[in-house]
């Protein structure tokens, strides 16, 4: 979820995290005795939990500490899905632990951030869509987030029977948590760093609202007349209203999302029996084996569980996409055909539209209009006053005025309101494609409009303006959100990321009453539903589609579900999205087509190991994923083709030293459509690129039959930084299976 480039959801989203492999160079004389939490990974899931926990204690005791101290230092033993533990160690102790024969890897625990109605109709999943309700009721979706609001209407269990027999999870009792029902069938929290700030509650209850919003988006029941103070009124619902939810609270509003808690959440979800995991969390770029979400999702994949994750909110900068593992379905954020704007009426008769949600009707026809610079306390404060920073403004010059402020941080309207101002016009070129909620009359305009307003102020001694209450506006869509993180994939030049785009702008969904709408001091706005934007909001849309597909095909692998979603996507116009597939992957989700894709590109865990070997991984770096140091790439049959992966998309990265590049991609598809089918290849090649497919026709005589083919791509050298788009479509009379082909020339090798 996002608020602004600077505030990032104010108190919650400023938290960042990176996993560091422990090495002697990271320790210094100053921190040698300082202790921090580390995750010590020992390998695959053990057979005997009790003996494994004893082993964890004994390993800690070997650091010349007592058994009692070892028990105090250990905060987690992971024994249900993999073998690991988390404990408080000094850098020297962590180094010694890494040298132990039993230990596969050691990583420092740090923190990640959250990537934070009409959208389902927009993507083609209306209430009338075909459903297998009996199977849908058996689908269990695990959400790793900030908790959930069990009293929300979105989580009523009317008409739902008891949880599926396969469910092994639990639900409290917990403090300040009313409990689960047949909709929310599981709820747990994870917090063992000893840091519980004031206002937090040790329970799965959501005091931030993020987890409630994402959970209701993926599987909320129908709630009629849902709105935000009358805005975006309609029926709120999730993709699969009959599916079950399990909440794993791994993020805390004031202290973030810890590695060790995220791993504990994954372990619990795997053990409990979820089938889809939705996680709208991310952090700085890391390699595939040193990232807690990567490791947790790999183990989930091995158990047949698909992890759907947000791509991140660091766009439009290139190479910023996170959660870019091939076994994760990585989601970009797109816009739907509505937005929210407020009209600004100037005293000279001119009017402009500002972006944002301001639910306040003006009490006067107009107010004096003043720039932040003109309201400065003194000359020395004028630079800071242009941003309307509180300490730089003269209260008397602000009171009763509409202020014009440059964007310099979040909560500008809070400052203006506290000074008695009548409103704020915020000038910014950041994220003007999504509507920020304001706690006072306010709206955002781009710098071009801002300059016109500044000129008006300077042209008269009696400038005036009024900000009207927000209204809903219809706009062209879909388009990729400016904030949505872009490729190319920083983890691999051979793998296209993100995978897919889904609505993530101005999404109405359930919220908590334990937090105001903005989270800013002085905000008195509370609502059971709110409008949020971010790849955090896009992620549960795709998780919901994955659950929808799962309800039709309970036996499909994570890779098959992922393939179905990517190859059935609706194309997004490259003309309005210059980053092309690096912005939206396969395109916009198309739920009903995803349930009947015709062909799928399937894979198992060995396929991903082959890919990693092709990426240069070795026994040591593979160990956190596969659970042992004994897996050697030299003993594994190499993956076929240029990318060693049976992926539903193709990416070729050119080398600047060559005048042309030729690559052969090997693929295999499985027939999941009519038993007797014939598919013919259609290729679209961009200028300067040759694409051939062999064979050009695939014939199937039965269901689940597999057919292999190769795609040969030959591309001339291009301008550094350029991306061109090709396409392979396998067509039958009933199905069209789309695979984007991306050719990219990096800015440097």
Swiss-Prot record:
Instruction: Spell out the residue numbers of the propeptide.
Output: 29-115
Tissue expression: Expressed only in roots, particularly in xylem.
Q: Fetch the InterPro entries from UniProt.
A: Peptidase_S8/S53_dom, Peptidase_S8/S53_dom_sf, Peptidase_S8_Ser-AS, Peptidase_S8_subtilisin-rel, Peptidases_S8_3, S8pro/Inhibitor_I9, S8pro/Inhibitor_I9_sf, SBT
Q: What Pfam family is a match, any one? A: fn3_6
Under the heading CDD domains, the entry gives: PA_subtilisin_like, Peptidases_S8_3
Provide the glycosylation site positions. 176, 225, 233, 446, 458, 618
A GO MF annotation of the entry reads:
serine-type endopeptidase activity
Give the record's GO biological process terms: proteolysis
EC numbers for this chain: 3.4.21.-
What sequence ranges are listed for the domain Inhibitor I9? Answer: 38-115
* Post-translational modifications: The C-terminal propeptide is autocleaved.
State the active site: 145, 210, 536
Which key words tag this protein in UniProt? Autocatalytic cleavage, Glycoprotein, Hydrolase, Protease, Serine protease, Signal, Zymogen
- Its family? Belongs to the peptidase S8 family.
PANTHER family cross-referenced by the UniProt entry: PROPROTEIN CONVERTASE SUBTILISIN/KEXIN
> What is this protein called in UniProt?
Subtilisin-like protease SBT4.14
Task: Write the gene name.
Answer: SBT4.14
């Amino acid at each position: 979820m996002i608020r602004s480039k600077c505030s990032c959801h104010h108190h919650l989203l400023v938290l960042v995290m990176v996993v560091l492999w422990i090495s002697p160079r990271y320790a210094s004389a100053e921190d040698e005795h300082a202790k921090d939490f580390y995750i010590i990974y020992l390998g695959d899931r053990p057979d005997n939990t009790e003996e494994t926990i004893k082993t964890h204690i004994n390993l800690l005791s070997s650091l010349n500490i007592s058994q009692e101290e070892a028990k105090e230092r250990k905060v987690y033993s992971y024994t249900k899905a993999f073998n690991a533990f988390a404990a408080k160690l000094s850098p020297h102790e962590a180094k010694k632990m890494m040298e132990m024969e039993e230990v596969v890897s050691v990583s420092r625990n740090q923190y990640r951030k959250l990537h934070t109605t009409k959208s389902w109709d927009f993507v083609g999943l209306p209430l009338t869509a075909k459903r297998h309700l009996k199977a849908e009721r058996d689908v269990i979706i695990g959400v790793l987030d900030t908790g959930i609001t069990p009293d929300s209407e979105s989580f009523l269990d009317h008409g739902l029977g008891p949880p599926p027999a396969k469910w092994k999870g639990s639900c409290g009792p917990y403090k300040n948590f009313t409990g689960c029902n047949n909709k929310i069938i599981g709820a747990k929290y994870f917090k063992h760093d000893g840091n519980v700030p004031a206002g937090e509650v040790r329970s799965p209850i959501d005091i931030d609202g993020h987890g409630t919003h994402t959970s209701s988006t993926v599987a909320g029941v129908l709630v009629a007349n849902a709105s935000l103070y009358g805005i975006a009124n309609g029926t709120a619902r999730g993709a699969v209203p009959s599916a079950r939810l399990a909440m794993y609270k791994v993020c805390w509003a004031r202290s973030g999302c810890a590695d060790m808690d995220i791993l504990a959440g994954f372990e619990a979800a795997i053990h409990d029996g979820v089938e889809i995991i939705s996680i709208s969390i991310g952090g700085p770029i890391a390699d595939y084996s040193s990232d807690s979400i990567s490791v947790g999702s790999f183990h989930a994949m091995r158990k047949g569980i698909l992890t759907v994750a947000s791509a991140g909110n660091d766009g439009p900068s290139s190479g910023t996409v996170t959660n870019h593992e091939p076994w994760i379905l990585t989601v970009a954020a797109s816009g739907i055909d509505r937005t929210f704007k407020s009209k600004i009426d100037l005293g000279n008769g001119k009017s402009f539209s500002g972006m944002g949600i301001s639910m306040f009707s003006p009490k006067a026809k107009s107010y004096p209009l003043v720039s932040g610079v003109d309201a400065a306390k003194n000359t020395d404060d004028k630079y800071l006053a242009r941003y309307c920073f509180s300490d730089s403004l003269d209260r008397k010059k602000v009171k009763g005025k509409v202020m014009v402020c440059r964007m310099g941080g979040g909560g500008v309207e809070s400052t203006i309101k506290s000074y008695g101002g009548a409103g704020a016009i915020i000038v910014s070129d950041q994220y003007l494609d999504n509507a920020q909620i304001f706690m006072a009359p306010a709206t955002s305009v781009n710098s071009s409009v801002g300059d016109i307003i500044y000129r008006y102020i300077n042209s008269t001694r009696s400038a005036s303006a009024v900000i009207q209450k927000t209204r809903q506006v219809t706009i062209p869509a879909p388009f990729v959100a400016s904030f949505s993180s872009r490729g190319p994939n920083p983890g691999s030049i051979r793998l296209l990321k993100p995978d897919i785009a889904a609505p993530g702008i101005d999404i109405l969904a359930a919220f908590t009453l334990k937090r105001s709408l903005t989270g800013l001091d002085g905000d008195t706005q509370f609502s059971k539903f709110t409008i949020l934007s971010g790849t955090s909001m896009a992620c549960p849309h795709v998780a919901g589609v994955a659950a929808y597909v799962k309800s039709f095909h309970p036996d499909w692998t994570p890779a098959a579900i992922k393939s179905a979603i990517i190859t059935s996507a609706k194309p997004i116009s490259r003309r309005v999205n210059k980053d092309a597939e690096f912005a939206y992957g396969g395109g916009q989700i198309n739920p009903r087509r995803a349930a009947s894709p015709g062909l799928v590109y399937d894979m198992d865990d060995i396929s991903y190991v082959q890919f990693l070997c092709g990426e240069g991984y070795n026994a040591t770096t593979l160990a956190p994923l596969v659970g042992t140091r004994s897996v050697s790439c030299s003993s594994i049959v190499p993956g076929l083709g240029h990318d060693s992966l049976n992926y539903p998309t193709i990416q070729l990265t050119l080398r600047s030293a060559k005048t042309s590049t030729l690559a052969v991609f090997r693929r295999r598809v499985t027939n999941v459509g009519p038993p007797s089918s014939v598919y013919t290849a259609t290729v679209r090649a961009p200028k300067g690129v040759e694409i051939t497919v062999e064979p050009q026709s695939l014939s199937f005589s039965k269901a689940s039959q597999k057919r292999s083919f190769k795609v040969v791509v030959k591309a001339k050298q291009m301008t550094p930084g350029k991306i061109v788009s090709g396409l392979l479509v396998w067509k039958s009379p009933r199905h069209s299976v789309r695979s984007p082909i991306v050719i990219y020339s990096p800015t440097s090798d």
